[in-house]
From Swiss-Prot:
It comes from the Bacteria. Involved in base excision repair of DNA damaged by oxidation or by mutagenic agents. Acts as a DNA glycosylase that recognizes and removes damaged bases. Has a preference for oxidized purines, such as 7,8-dihydro-8-oxoguanine (8-oxoG). Has AP (apurinic/apyrimidinic) lyase activity and introduces nicks in the DNA strand. Cleaves the DNA backbone by beta-delta elimination to generate a single-strand break at the site of the removed base with both 3'- and 5'-phosphates. It comes from Chelativorans sp. (strain BNC1). This is Formamidopyrimidine-DNA glycosylase. Pfam families: Fapy_DNA_glyco (PF01149), H2TH (PF06831), zf-FPG_IleRS (PF06827). Its EC number is 3.2.2.23, 4.2.99.18. It catalyses: Hydrolysis of DNA containing ring-opened 7-methylguanine residues, releasing 2,6-diamino-4-hydroxy-5-(N-methyl)formamidopyrimidine; 2'-deoxyribonucleotide-(2'-deoxyribose 5'-phosphate)-2'-deoxyribonucleotide-DNA = a 3'-end 2'-deoxyribonucleotide-(2,3-dehydro-2,3-deoxyribose 5'-phosphate)-DNA + a 5'-end 5'-phospho-2'-deoxyribonucleoside-DNA + H(+). The gene is mutM. Its cofactor is Zn(2+). Monomer.
Length: 297
């Protein structure tokens, strides 16, 4: 499933084409994805100017001039691609559209761009676990999808002091706590594994032990907060990780998977200088966890 860096990469890829463009027409080729489309979906967005493209956790947010927000979640295999007018080439690296996947093109946005010309933005989703919703912008933060979301792991908002307060008293394993979207929004399996390795903390450790009993920051919470921010920033800069179904909006692949230190490296030597450990895998919360039992404590 695409995680926060992948969704942010898609947002940045779509932004130059979609922001400021007007939606001339929407081809909705089926009645549902994971959930049914909102009633009158195509008509509600037709003719609207896209004011801004945002992101909250793993959700893409298209802010429309009519006061509504088109919320899109990529699910397991959802992706967007861009086709410029007069060409079937994808913008950017000139990857041609993959004809075998066209049967999974479920939504096509026909756009008039603000600087002139036109484009099509196509949503493709073989497994159909993604979805699209239309919400009034005033109701966005109160909607069940967003009301309980925690702090974003980007920028400086997530520091050691805040992380200590969030995890104080939590008896869950540290990895499970970090993936609780009510605490930190947008973190997923891959990047939690990587951040824990960088911070030298075991995914099995009780979450509360990175803080004092009073919920104050410690060296552990400071290291972990810094590792989370750095891993997310580096993954965004690398265009995310191309595992299975994920591609960027221009059709190209992400490259952060080439920087993995623990994820999907079971049985390989730990990359930390001076560590003699071997990366191990175990199932935690129904997901594969990768870590070094020597340097992660």
């Amino acid at each position: 499933m695409p995680e926060l860096p992948e969704v942010e990469t898609v947002r940045r890829g779509l932004e130059p084409v979609m922001e400021g463009a007007r939606i001339i027409h929407v081809e909705q080729r089926r009645a549902d994805l994971r959930f049914p489309f909102p009633a009158g979906f195509s008509e509600h967005v037709k003719g609207c100017r896209i004011e801004a493209l945002g992101r909250r956790a793993k959700y893409l947010l298209l802010h429309l001039e009519n006061g509504r927000v088109l919320v899109s979640h990529l699910g397991m295999s959802g992706s967007f691609r861009i086709e410029e007018s007069g060409s079937d080439k994808l913008r950017g690296d000139f990857h041609y559209a993959r004809s075998k996947a066209e049967k999974h093109d479920h939504v096509v946005f026909h756009l008039a761009r603000h600087e002139g010309g036109s484009a099509r933005v196509i949503y493709n989703d073989p497994r159909r676990f993604g979805f699209m919703l239309l919400l009034d912008s005033a109701d966005l933060e109160a909607h069940p999808l967003f009301a309980g979301l925690g702090v974003e792991p980007t920028g400086n908002a997530l520091d050691g002091a805040l992380l200590a307060r969030l995890l104080a008293g939590k008896r869950a394993p540290l990895k499970a706590a970090l993936m609780d979207q009510r605490l930190v929004a947008g973190l997923g399996n891959i990047y939690v594994c990587e951040a824990l390795w960088r911070a030298g903390l075991s995914p099995r450790r009780i979450a509360a032990t990175i803080a004092t009993r009073e919920g104050k920051s410690t060296g552990r919470s400071e290291r972990l907060a810094g590792a989370i921010r750095t891993v997310i920033a580096e993954a965004i800069a690398a265009g995310g990780s191309s595992l299975k179904d994920y591609v960027q909006a221009d059709g190209s692949l992400g490259y952060f998977q080439h920087s993995f230190s623990v994820y999907d490296r079971e049985g390989k030597p730990c990359r930390k200088e001076g560590c003699s450990g071997t990366i191990q895998r175990f199932v935690q919360g129904g997901r594969s966890t990768f870590y070094c039992p020597i340097c992660q404590r």
